[in-house]
Structures are given as structure tokens and as C-alpha cells.
């Protein structure tokens, strides 16, 4: 049975989603979870694009041991050199090279002739092979390329040493039948193509990324590139969880196998959603909250009698928990640490100690602490602190039906200086955000505001997600507290801290368009 490798690009292509800006700690946590999911390859970033990306790729390569870590590179030596410096400490360093091959890209973007493109691709592969044991080569915008030229350049890069050939549908243009035919054409027209692995990379602009990826697998691809929850630029990428479960449930049809641990899918989906702020639609296949819900009376009756009447995927297959452990104010540090590890999170002794303090504070106000509560506390403790930027000291909001909402906020900056401001607004949240904007002394545009309850009950934690734009940077933030307004303030501060973090970490190089 053929083995299909999963190449996860959540940390590279997925992070190109509008408003998604992950910090180093968040990227490392996602990489560790992808390792638990047992993906074959993690594309950790684009090392030459910025200092922040370089450092993230380097640390992920040095941390992950049971799967290969790769980075993206243009077909230029400086990019390849940067990628090698970032990836050389990995368990299996590999490089992902790309260059555009469609007429529209060669003429208008590269301004190169087809012969020049072939020469650049071959030279880049040969140079990369001096360092990397595995070189993957991608034909950007392959699906709008002329097939004879595509076959010619693929043949040349194979001769130069590429061992993986990726055929990206960069703009989500292709149909399943056409995509499969490209793979067949290459297999029939490229010498020695049987000695390399063929890879699929699909975008979802026409809603066909997953089915196109499956078509590629049917027609000879042995690697598929995808992201968790299908996040990515524009309409997103092919969703890893949908492809993986389709291959498992319909193994009779596809006749392939993977090394994925499917029981880690739901946990991975939740982690990526929380850290990126990208909501998983309720009706999303495999990981949506309604994926296993049955509303129809006839369906409910059938499922109660025999699950397989209306349920082709069991919740347990993808790690949807049937119950959760409840902790309380009498639970000790050891029980807390054990549960944190069972939930799949890695915390240092210092982080556990700080989490235990927050846990006890919440346990004094809330009788039962569920897994959802604990995860919210972990996120706040592990990912939402920016010690070098603003931290909330206190808020006070006055509101009444016949009063103008007024907020008073006290913040501390990275140097420990105290900042106090007050402002009014049409509502409590606006008053709060107007006050915070005065503290930051910078104009901020609120693009989105969303509030969720963590679990049920009147004593549930509130979790607020915001998306903002400041200094021409669009980013998201999150905050958790029992009080809605405190959670709202934390989310806004978290988002602004990310803006300042991005500005501080920006290198001289700007982000580059990629496949």
C-alpha cells in the first residue's frame, strides 16, 4: 500500500492569513503539537524573509526530532544560505525551493524568459544540494503553466538533484480532473520521474483544495501539502484534517496509508484556532463543533440504535473527548501538572507555578475547573504575556442607563512606568478601548470583536478575541477573565503588544509572495 507523506505548512502559508501574527513561543507550541500529530514535514517559515522567521525556523528545527523541518527559499543563493543556517541543526534538514513557471508570472513578475527560469531553477537546486540532503522544488503557479514547459523544467531540476517535485495550484484555479491530468502528464513525459516524490499543494479560492489534493493522490502524488483548519492566504489552503480523515475512512478506495496520529487532530485544530484567532466554522468537516451533532429526530433515533446509520466518523477517531476531568480548589500542584501534560501542553516549572496561582484564584471563584478553563489559563500564562510591552494593572468602568459610560485604566509599560488614562464612549467597551488608545498614544482601528464563553454556567470564564490595525499592521489578540470587560481589555492590550512586537522584530527584508 502506498504511503502518503503530510507536509504541514500552517506555520508558513497558514500564517499568511490576514491578521495572523504568531510569536516564537506560539510557533514552537504548534510545532510540538504537529510532531505529536506525526506529520512528516513541518514547513516552519521563510528564513530569508525576516529575522523573526529565521529565528523561528532555527528554533523549531532544533526542537523537533521525529519529523523533518523545512523552510521556503527563492531560487537565489542568499535565500539558500539563510535557510541552511536556520535548518542545519534539524534532525533531517530539507529545503523548499520555488520559482514561477506560468507565462503570466514569468512575463510580469520575474521578467525572465523560459530559458532563464530553467537556468535559475537548475543553478539553485545544484547549489542547495551542496548543503541539504533533501531538496524539494516547486513550480509556482504550475496549474497555469504550459505543460510541455512544465515537463521540461521538472526534468532539468530532477537531473540537478531535486528529490521532491511540488505542483502548486497557487491561485486555486484548477479543477480535480485537470489537476490529476497534470500529474499523469508529468509521469508520462518526464524521464526518471519515478525516482522522485510528487507533491500536491492546493489553495481553496474555488472551494476545491481538498478534492484537488485527493485527486493528486489518486494520480500518483505521494506527498500532500496542507494546513490545520485550512487556514492560509485569501480563501486558505487544503485542510489537513479533511484529507487525512478522507484517506482513512475511504482506505478501501484510495488504497494508501499515512503515519498520522488521527486522535491528535481535534487538539491540534483547537490549538491553532486559539493561537491564530481564526474561528473554526461550526459546520466545518471533521473539527467543527457541529461535526458530530444530530438535530433531526430520525437521525437521532438512528444514531441511538446504531451509530453508523448516520455517523461515518466517530468523534473518538479524531480525539473529540467524551468527557473531561474536573479539578477544584482542593486539587494540588501534582494533579494540575498531570492534567496539563495529559492535555498535551509543555510547561516549565516556573510556568506551572504561575499557572497554579491563577488556578487557585479561579478555583476560589468557581467550584469546578474544567479542561476548557484550564486550557484558557494555560494560554493566558504561556502565550499572552509580553513583559517588554504593556501590562494591565487595573480597570474601572462606570455604566448606567442614564450615565455616560466612563472607563479608567492603569497600565504598566515595559520599563515599569505606570500610565493612567480615562475616557468615555457610547458603550462600556468603547469607553474602555478609547481609554486604552490614549494610553498607547497611537490610533487603533478595531476590525473585529468576538466574545465566547469558556464552558457553561453563569460563573464561566469569558474569552474575547479582537482584530485590530495599527501602524499599518493588522493583527489579532485574545484575553480571558471572569469579567467580560477585563477580558476585553486584555484582548485589546494583547493585540497592541503584538503590533509593537512585530515592529521590534521586523528585519530589513519584506515578506515575499510565495506558492
UniProtKB/Swiss-Prot annotation:
Pfam families: HCS_D2, HMGL-like, LeuA_dimer. It comes from the Bacteria. It catalyses: 3-methyl-2-oxobutanoate + acetyl-CoA + H2O = (2S)-2-isopropylmalate + CoA + H(+). Its EC number is 2.3.3.13. Keywords: Amino-acid biosynthesis, Branched-chain amino acid biosynthesis, Cytoplasm, Leucine biosynthesis, Manganese, Metal-binding, Transferase. It is found in: Cytoplasm. GO terms for molecular function: 2-isopropylmalate synthase activity; acetyl-CoA C-acetyltransferase activity; manganese ion binding. Pathway: Amino-acid biosynthesis; L-leucine biosynthesis; L-leucine from 3-methyl-2-oxobutanoate: step 1/4. Mn(2+) binds at residues 13, 201, 203, 237. Its cofactor is Mn(2+). Residues 4-266 form the Pyruvate carboxyltransferase domain. SUPFAM superfamilies: 2-isopropylmalate synthase LeuA, allosteric (dimerisation) domain (SSF110921), Aldolase (SSF51569). One of its GO terms (biological process) is L-leucine biosynthetic process. Belongs to the alpha-IPM synthase/homocitrate synthase family. LeuA type 1 subfamily. Homodimer. Catalyzes the condensation of the acetyl group of acetyl-CoA with 3-methyl-2-oxobutanoate (2-ketoisovalerate) to form 3-carboxy-3-hydroxy-4-methylpentanoate (2-isopropylmalate). This is 2-isopropylmalate synthase.
